[in-house]
Structure formats: structure tokens, C-alpha cells
Amino acid sequence: EILDIFKITPKYDLDIMIERQTLEHVTSSILMKLSDILAKEQPDMILVHGDTNTCLSASLAAFYKKIPIGHVEAGLRTDDIYSPYPEEFVRRTVDSISSLYFCPTINNADNLIKENISKDGIYITGNTVIDTLQTTVKKDYTFKEPLLNRIDYNNKRIIPITAHRRENIGVNLENICNAIKTLASKYPDAHFIYTVHPNPAVKNTANRILEGIDNVSLLPPLIFTDLHNLIARAYFVMTDSGGLQEEAPSLGVPVLVLRRETERPEAVQAGTVKLTGVEYKNIVRDGRMLFDNKSVYDKMSNAVNPYGDGKASRRIVDAIKEYFKNL
């Protein structure tokens, strides 16, 4: 779907997705298939993005063939290798073998310098997701998810929710869902839209606690454009996701982060994001604060977005040109 938005036709499809596969299986499948492709194509550089298993596997495949790596969204850190898991390990590993580092913020660049990475390869670009929002968010937008077209956005306070991280499955997710249930009861004028990950451990908990509540909708994961346009119409967002901590503030929407730490402290420092955590009482407290305290809400929604001006992609292209020009 993202490829369609930007009219990109991939030359290769690794076709590795199967249900219930382990991290080890995903990593090895990508590594083996991509290794063959790199041997055939012999690229001058590969670009990897973020902190997924695909990012890790592609970086390893390139490193084994001594192909330079450019890491988009480099330098994010929580300082706890198991939180988020396995993303923190992925980005530390990828940054240890990259040649170019495209950092969303100054803080990310500083993290790399502290790890003795040369300044020569570090570029502060902003985040590419801000570039994307300029294409995906539209004033007159028809959602692909039918339910989203039936919502009264003018008279309802819309609260999109994502909560699916591995480290939150279990008691933490139950706390999150019970807090949503409490807030939904206290604020009948709000509509809580939880996009539920298909992982049975997530789906079963969400259904057990939240199914049947009038102002809570449980939806499958949304396509990219639906999610962005829903956020643009939201009152605030509740999430344990990384990307939404950047996307929502860019649209003037406050965020409650349902995690104990974040690799994106810039938004917390700027005041657009609050690190709420995973305790029931804290989630309810911070939710009520945004519903009831207009001055706090206005301060969060009007804070300056720290993640760039929508020109990150151009800066990345220019940095790559400079790299090869100086070889």
C-alpha cells in the first residue's frame, strides 16, 4: 500500500511472511534471500530504515559483502537493550556497521558521537515520516475502513489507540485495556478507536476487556493513509508505537506513550508527548488530564514539533551524493 502511494514497483519480493514465525526465522529468511540478490545486483550502497528485523537482516547481508550501509532513522536509543525488544538491539547493531547515519534530531546524532562514531558520516535530516504526511493527509479524505466514514468527527473527541509491543503483552496490556474501559465510561462524548494487532495475545486481551463498549471500536490494523488521516482528526493519541510519537505531534495532536521509556525523548522535552507508562492509574490520570484540563491540552497540542520540516528525504539524497563524490 505504501509502495502504491509513491508509485513504486519493487523489483524483488522476498515473500517471507508466514503466520507465527519466530524472530530467528524472519532474520534468517531475509538474510539468505537478500544475500543472493546483493550478489547478483552488486549495489554501491544499501539503505535501511528504522529498527525492524528487516533492517537488521539487510544490514548483515550488506556487511558480509562489504557493501556500505546508510541507516535512515539512526541514533535512537533508550539505553535498555530489552526495551523496546528487539528494536533497541537492532538499531545499536546496525549503527555499529553503517557508513552513513541519517539522524532525525540533534539528540540522535549526539548518541552516535558518544558511541565513538565519526562525525563525518552523521547527518541531521529530520524524519522522513514528516515528508510522508505531506502526501498522505488530506482535508477531504474517504477512509478505506468503512466504520471511520461513519464517525461524527465534529462532535466526538476521537482517541486512536495502538498497543501491541512484545514487552507490553500480558499484565501491561491488561492495564492499558482496563484504563481505556474506565476512560470510555467517564467520557461518553469520546470515541476510542483501538487498532488491534492480529497477534492472538493482543487480540484476545483487547476483545475480552473492551468488546461491546458503545464508544470503543476495535479495528484491524489500518492502512497507512487511513491511520494518518485518523490521527489528523484526533483529539489525542494513546500508543506504545514509535512512529506515532513523531506523526501525531507533527499534526498538532498530543500523545500519551504507553511505555516506561522512549527512544524519542525530543517530543517529551518539547511537550508534545507525555511518557505515561503502563500502570492503570497513570493511564487514567493522564487521559483525564487531557480531557479535563484545557490549558494542559492546548500546551501539548501547540508545542513545536521536533522532528523536522518535511525535507528529510532531500537531505538524505544530497548526503549520499556527497559520499560518493568524495570517494
Model-predicted regions and their roles:
Residues 1-194, 199-327:
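Nucleotide-activated sugar donor-binding and catalytic core shared by glycosyltransferases
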